[in-house]
Amino acid sequence: MELIVSILWLAITAENLANTLATNYCNLQSCKRNNAIHTMCQYTSPTPGPMCLEYSNVGFTDAEKDAIVNKHNELRQRVASGKEMRGTNGPQPPAVKMPNLTWDPELATIAQRWANQCTFEHDACRNVERFAVGQNIAATSSSGKNKSTPNEMILLWYNEVKDFDNRWISSFPSDDNILMKVGHYTQIVWAKTTKIGCGRIMFKEPDNWTKHYLVCNYGPAGNVLGAPIYEIKK
């Protein structure tokens, strides 16, 4: 049984890698409609870019990937089960359904390609042929050997729940100020999102501090204006 599972996992991984290699990201219609250049088209080299000084810790081990997925799913289930007590007007209500996320190598490849530019902003287009893709980014700086773990940075996103009004659950608001305050949290708990892939890099800043940069891509994308974040369990 273990051999069969291993073979199946390798087959799925190979298929996802083939999808990444086969996709013509420069002709992706979902990018063209917004006059945006896809990250994989704009940055064809997998090598970190010129902004990445003395870079290290590029990408993740399998154990780190599992930890990222598990932390996301732990937080999603906290909300789905009605155990999140924070919010601007009370606890977050439970969800009818909020499936666990799984790691997606194509999303991870695109996230890593963007992280490798060492530019702390969202990329213009990261969609794949299967669906539109959302994104969370985080960066911390340190002067010594201490470094932020991915899970600590994920919690920075999730903790936006303290500013979240549960009346927004049924229809994601169009107010950009709200998106700026809680958009990382809502992407984490967006019920229709099922895939995640992340990239990571550390590099030196001009002031000699070390920047820790995390990019996570999600599909299908959350934060769709007017759409429900999840269905509330009555």
Swiss-Prot record:
Annotated segments matching region Disordered: 80-99
Residue stretches making up the SCP domain: 69-218
Cysteine disulfide partners in this protein: C26-C41, C31-C125, C52-C118, C198-C216
Keywords: Allergen, Disulfide bond, Secreted, Signal
SMART domains: SCP
Subcellular location: Secreted
Database matches in Pfam families: CAP (PF00188)
First and last residue of the signal peptide: 1-22
Cellular component GO terms, alphabetical: extracellular region
Summary of the tissues where the protein is detected: Expressed by the venom gland.
Main localisation: secreted
Signal in keyword set: yes
Protein family according to the UniProt entry: Belongs to the CRISP family.
Record protein name field: Venom allergen 3
